[in-house]
Each structure stands twice: as C-alpha cells, then as structure tokens.
Amino acid sequence: MSFQSINIDKWLKNAVAAQGFKKMTPVQANAIPLFLKNKDLVVEAVTGSGKTLAYLLPCFDKVTRRDTDETGLGALIVAPTRELATQIFNVTKELLAYQPDSLDGGKKLVADMYIGGKGTLTNDLASFREKNPSVVIGTPGRLNEMLSHISSKHLEILILDEADTLIDMGFQRTLQSIISQLPKQRRTGLFSATMNDTVSSFLKIAGLRNSVRVSVTVTSKKIDTRTPSSLAIQSLVIPPIYKVQCMIHLLCTIEYEKAIVFFSSCASVEYFNSLFLTYKLPFEIVALHGQQVQSNRSRNFEKFKKSNKKTVLFTTDIASRGLDIPNVDFVLQLDPPLDPKSFSHRCGRAGRAGRAGVAIVLLNDGREEEYEELLRVRKVPITRIDTPIEALDLSRLKVLTHELRKIVSKDRDLYDKGLRAFVSHVRAYTKHHASFIFRIKDLDLGQLATAYALLHLPKMPELKDTEISENIFKKFDIDYATIPYRDQVREQARRRRLEVEKTEPKKLARPAKIKNEAWSKQKEVKEKRNTRREKRKSKKEFLKAQKNEASNNLKQEIVSKAGAQETENDDLIDEESDALSELEEDYRQLKKSKKRKNQASFGFSM
C-alpha cells in the first residue's frame, strides 16, 4: 500500500516522497487509515517498524484540518527519554519543512519540543507563548509542569510513544496528571513494542475504553517473533574472566559501520569508555548514559548519530528504546538487561527498516545458559555461536588483560572508576528480574574482577565470605597509594590530603573489644542486646500491623469508589503483582521447556 493512496493532505504526501518512502510498512498501513477515521489506537509492533510516521502523518493532517477558530496546541506527543523526544522532533521538523507558504485557512503548523534538563520551565513557557506551537513533543515531567500554565482546550490528539517504557520508568502518575489536564473529546494513540499486563491495565486510565488494537508481528517459517526477520540474534557462552576481552575481540573483527555495546550500569560505561580511549582501539568510542549532564548527552548522541566512520556507542538501557540511529549493524550486550523485556529492544537498534543486523549477547557459562530458553519462551529467536573458547586465542586475551591492568596502574582516575564499575555491576546483578537464572552466588567474582582489569578486590558485602583463588585473581604488585592522577590539579590536591593525614592525629577509633572480659560483664551486655532485639521485633510487628490495617482500609476505600477512579486505583495497587505474575509465568514455561527436552533426550514420547 502506497502513501499516495491514503487520504492525507497533498503536502504531506510530497514530504514523505521526498524522504524516499514509497510504500507503507505493515504498521503504517494498518494504523494510519484507522487514525484518520477518528479511532483511538493501541498499536503493538516490533522495533524499527515505522511507528513514528504511523502517528505523525495523521497528527499533522488532523491538526491542519481544524476549524479556523481553533488555534494553539493541537497535538501532544509524549516520549520516555530526551533522546527519543529529540529524534521525534527532528523527524517532525523535516516533514514540516515541506509545508507550502500558505495553507487553507492559514493554519500553518508549528512544532516545538520541551524536555527536562534543558533550560528552565520559565524559558519553555516563554518559548511556547512566543511560538504558539500546534504540535508539542516532550518528556512527561516537563510537559506535566507546562500544562498547568497553558491552554489545551483545542487539543485534538494525544500520542504516548513507547508506552511500556513510560510506565516501566515510573511515569504512570505523571501520565495520569497529564491526561487529567486534557480535553476528554480527543483522539489517543498508544504505541509500544510490547503490550504487557501493566500497559493493558493503563488503557482505561488513558481514556482508551473503545480503542482499536493493531498488533504487527513478524512471521518467519510459521513462527511468530517479536523481532525483525532481518536481525540475527545470537549468544556466546564464555567464562566471565574473558568477557571484556572477548567484547574487544568481537568489536575488532566483526564488519559494521556503527555498533552499540550495552552495559548494566552508568559506572561501567564511564570506566570502559575511559579505559579504551587510553588503549587506543581501531574505532571511535562514544559514551551515553543517564548520569551525564544533558549537554554532554545531547552532544554525544548527535556525534554518534552523525559519525561517518567506524564508531561504537557504549551505553545503558537509555538507548535501548525507540531511537532510530542510521547504519547500526551490530549490537553487543556485555551484560543482559535486568528486565528480560528490554532484550528485544536492545537488539532492535540493529536491523531496522529491513536492514540486515547482528545482535550478540555474552553469557557466563553455567546457569546463565538457561537465559537462551527464557528468550525463546518470550518469542525471541536466538541461536548459540558454537565457536570453541580456544578459537578466541586465549593467550592474546590474557596479554590484553595484563596490558589493561598496566594502564590502570598508571592512572588513579581509571583505578577509582574500575572499582566503582565493578561494585555497580555486582549490585545490578542482584537486581535481575529473572533471579531464578541470574544468582549472585553462581557468579564467579574473581573471574569478573580479572575481566574488569582490577588491581585488587574492593571491600563489599558480596565478597565478605568469598574465597578467591590466586589462580583466578591475583593482586597487581604495586603500592596503590602511589598511583597518581593524570590531571595535575587533582594529583596535587590528593598529595596535600595525604600530607594533612600524616601530620594530624587520627580520629579516636572505637575501643577494641576485650577478649577476656569478665563473664558477668558479657552476660550483662548480652541481656541488653536481647532487650534491644525484642524492642525492634515488637516495633516491626506493630508497624506491620499498621501497614496491613492501612492496606485493608485503602482496599475498602477503593472498592467503595465507582467507575474510572476504582479502576485507576486498582491498577496502581496491582501493578507490581502483574509484573511478578508475568515473570512467574516465564519461569513455569521455562521449566516445562526443560522438562520436554529431558524427556526427548531419554526417548520418552509426550
């Protein structure tokens, strides 16, 4: 189905044609005609399927055709991240550039973007009043603030892009506040790559009671999947001691224009970006994560997007959803995502719009290998790379590890960042939603520390009762106090602190425990300890009883309320249980799959 066959304004058809789009994707062919017929839509489609144009074209067409006396805000588009909002705004500007100088009724469209972390609310309100935009794109927090100061009575369309991410990131209450400030007589479009129970329960709150559902999946060899057929998803099982070095091996040997590497924490992104900038690899590295200041985030995102040479983006899940970055051929997940739902979104940064792509996830050998079956249960087709470990040239990987540790031993900034990255990775590992697969007690922390090129192990609770063999992790032979900062200002400040510590007396330490203390004294201390323990226990039981009573009162209050308010509060209470039920169902399906495999291996018939 071509864009020329749909009933939209001529200038929009010209704009799409000028961008090189001739035929609509399946999601566009299904969604656009329904939107033009004033239907509320709930659209589920795989990443890279053209969802942005599927809502922008109807938005522009409807706002253009408004009555002449209706001016001001006509369409509101909400995105979960600043990067996605910026991307939508850029596409919007490209399309609106094809507007003729004068439209029927003189209603030329103006678009603007408002996101957090960039300017103040006062500046954004001034910009809104000056430009009087008919199409507004932004992130939930800033849009919610602005709506209490501007008029939205002529709003025609509300779009929630990447709706599941909006909810997963904790924006549900903010979205409710936004929706409560908008006119009820509007069209609403909810677009998402996945449709889980939490999103489904949010539909009524969003005013989508009689919506039309559009679900576009990829069918390949009679198997429905949630990823593009042009994307090859693979796993590589490897001991954690070689994980980081294997990442470098893959980035240096696989053919690609642009690649994205996903880490589990911002600290890991910072550390490995700094480390490999020093190591000088044969490609450019750009870092992007949520703890960067907005100016750096925007600059780095644009740098990676516009790069015309071999470039790798080190990032977190901030770049896993919705972003359309051209020429990304390869996605590597050093760490699987904490939420299994994010896996397909990460992979989907490659293989967009029919372009061939490869996505590889590195799994630790052992229990993590079950992650492959969990993904298949979730309709993500994944195949294992059967490359033997020996083929990776282990001697070269060991040399690389030693070289990285030597670099760290000469730069205190890297030394500090490495320890923070290791700690943050271990703590993130304990927060995996699929905890029946990712268990901290099964993770070889000594091997992981070696892969991170640490000089010594940090002090942390997870290592308290763990014995690390010197064959696995050996401390680097150096006086850690002598490691300097490359930045002379920081190094001089550090040395001044050391001098002060030497000259000033140390703070009085807690008195050491007397081992041969009198028995009567020990008994008295023990009795006091037991008394305190009983008090804490009583207080805990009292608070628990109060919490249960408050919960029961809340449930009774919710039951007594009617209509939409009842549904709204019920959904908020059940949100966590929905997510838990989904994971429990995954676990049951995983056990069934393993059972069928075991029976098949012993020749039993089902």
Swiss-Prot record:
Gene3D superfamilies for the chain: P-loop containing nucleotide triphosphate hydrolases
Primary residence: nucleus
Keywords per UniProt: ATP-binding, Coiled coil, Helicase, Hydrolase, Nucleotide-binding, Nucleus, Ribosome biogenesis, RNA-binding, rRNA processing
Catalytic activity: ATP + H2O = ADP + phosphate + H(+)
First-tier enzyme category under EC: hydrolase
One example GO MF annotation: RNA helicase activity
Subcellular compartments: Nucleus, Nucleolus
Composition bias type Basic residues, residue spans: 529-539
Ranges in coiled-coil conformation: 521-601
A Pfam short name: DEAD
Keyword Cytoplasm: no
Domain Helicase C-terminal: 246-400
InterPro entries: CTT_SPB4, DEAD/DEAH_box_helicase_dom, Helicase_ATP-bd, Helicase_C-like, P-loop_NTPase, RNA_helicase_DEAD_Q_motif, SPB4-like_CTE
UniProt-listed SMART domains: DEXDc (SM00487), DUF4217 (SM01178), HELICc (SM00490)
BP terms from Gene Ontology: rRNA processing
Motif residue range(s): DEAD box: 161-164
CDD domains in alphabetical order: DEADc_DDX55, SF2_C_DEAD
Region ranges (Disordered): 521-574
EC code: 3.6.4.13
Residues binding ATP, per UniProt: 45-52
Protein family membership: Belongs to the DEAD box helicase family. DDX55/SPB4 subfamily.
Domain notes: The Q motif is unique to and characteristic of the DEAD box family of RNA helicases and controls ATP binding and hydrolysis.
Record protein name field: ATP-dependent rRNA helicase spb4
Gene: spb4
